Amino acid sequence: MKWKTKVNVRARKLPLLINTMGWTAAQGKRLGLEKSILEKYFPNRVNWINPTSNTNAKIDASFESNSGRRYTMRVYIPNDFPSSCPNMVIKEPASRIPDFPNLRTSHAGPRNHEGYLLICHFDKSKWSGQHTLYEVLMKGRLWLEAYEGHLSTGNEIDYYLKHMGE
C-alpha cells in the first residue's frame, strides 16, 4: 500500500506554534501546521513535551487498539525537522512490548536511551520534508495493530506490514 497522505506544507499559513527559541521561523511555522493537523485528526490524544526546545521536543500520542488495549507512542522531533525523520517508540505499556530477536520482520529496533522500543516507520533514506508527524503516528498505529495480530496468531509482524510501501 502506498501512502498518499501528503500535506502541502506551504499552502496554509498558520501562526507559530511557539516562541521558537532554538527553532528557525520556518520550523516554528511547520510545527504550528503539524500541531493543527494532529489536533484535527487526534483530538485530545496528543501531548507536546518541550515544544520550544529544538534539542528535546517530543510528542506523546495515546491510542486504543481495535482490541481495546491502550498504548502511548512517543515521537522525538529532531532538531532539523522536517529535514530528518523523527524516531518513534512505544512508551506505554513499555513492559508489555518485548524485545524482538529479528528486527527486520518485527519492524522494531533496539530500545532507545529511555528504554523504549524503537518502531521502524519510514526508511530514513526515503524521508522528505513533505512527510508529516500525522503520517508517522498513523504508521505507528498500524504497527500496533500488526503487533496485536502477532500476539493473537504468532505470525511475524512483517506478515501484516510487508505490503506497506514507503
How should each PLM-predicted stretch be described?
Residues 1-74, 80-166:
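UBC/E2-like fold recognition across ubiquitin and ubiquitin-like conjugation systems
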